[in-house]
Amino acid sequence: MPAAAAGPMGEMSPAGYHAGMSTQIDDPQIAPFSKFRDLTADIHVTMLTTRRADGLLHSRPMGTRAIESDGALWFFTADDSGKVNEIYHDQMVNVSYIKPGDQVYVSVAGKASLSRDRAKIRELWTPVLKTWFSEGVDDPNLALLRVDIVAIDYWEGPGKIVSLLKFAKSAVTGTPSKVGEYGTIVPPPKT
């Protein structure tokens, strides 16, 4: 997969997304995330939403660096960025994944925290990050944002053509049409 990039302050879309994803689904702590990983496998840029001090919501694009088997999402960030300050005041965030061509929409409610764990930074590091962190893994401003998933809502449609045909059939027959799948995933409490 080619490397891609987005914005400043660690808000990026690096190569190597979803590194370390587990395919094991028999563990009750892991199974809920199987559907989530399937839905987001090809979505590389997300929107992370935090709450500002004045109460307004603030969203910015981020690149998911990893989705752990326990549902933790990892993002690189600058530890002096505005989002970090917002998270210190309110840890609840939303992460949105959208793939409009396939009619996939995922909304993740989670609890965010900042990590300066150098071992984890080295594990998730990719050279494209030097664009924002010129000193590499030793950049003193480099940190990780961890989002622990609280709940996931998703909508998955059959695609544009099938959706249009179902809408047309519904208009002609006057009966509502189920155009896609909606679901909520609430992971079990961590043990």
Language-model segments: which ranges?
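Short, structured beta-strand-loop surface elements
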Residues: K83-I149
